[in-house]
Amino acid sequence: MLSVQPKGKQKGCAGCNRKIKDRYLLKALDKYWHEDCLKCACCDCRLGEVGSTLYTKANLILCRRDYLRLFGTTGNCAACSKLIPAFEMVMRARDNVYHLDCFACQLCNQRFCVGDKFFLKNNMILCQTDYEEGLMKEGYAPQVR
């Protein structure tokens, strides 16, 4: 997205229609932009500062967050049933999606860390201790993930 402008012919900015005299310019959607002119249509953030990816839909140029907010899909957390915004990081277990804070054993509330084993029983996530206790009491065998 960021380019060094070669000496010689200056490019015109697609945002303000003025010549780009700066050493650096942005190229997006086959057009050239001043760094200050390529902004998200919703939040006005400078897209050159927030990453190398921009999103476009319905003639709007958007940052990732606003694109997902406007056009992304949302769902509900399998643990708390509250809405999960499309831009939020999540944890997944099979077809279930969880807020990061909700990804914990649903019996003892122990939060899982990277690499921890968890078990799925009747769409409930369980830690190894609660799974083994339940296995001994009830004889159930959820799947290890």
UniProtKB/Swiss-Prot annotation:
Organism lineage string: Eukaryota, Metazoa, Chordata, Craniata, Vertebrata
Q: Which CDD domains does the UniProt entry name for this protein?
A: LIM1_LMO1_LMO3, LIM2_LMO1_LMO3
| Residues making up the signal peptide according to the UniProt record | none
Q: What induces it?
A: By dopamine.
Alphabetic keyword roster: LIM domain, Metal-binding, Repeat, Transcription, Transcription regulation, Zinc
Q: Does the keyword DNA repair apply?
A: no
Q: Which gene encodes it?
A: Lmo3
The UniProt entry, under InterPro entries, shows:
LMO_RBTN_TF, Znf_LIM
Q: Which GO BP terms apply?
A: negative regulation of transcription by RNA polymerase II; positive regulation of transcription by RNA polymerase II; regulation of T cell homeostatic proliferation
**Annotated LIM zinc-binding domain residues:** 11-73, 75-137
Recorded protein name is LIM domain only protein 3
GO MF term set = DNA-binding transcription factor binding; metal ion binding; transcription coactivator activity
Q: Name one GO cellular component term.
A: nucleus
Task: Report whether Transcription shows up as a keyword of the record.
Answer: yes
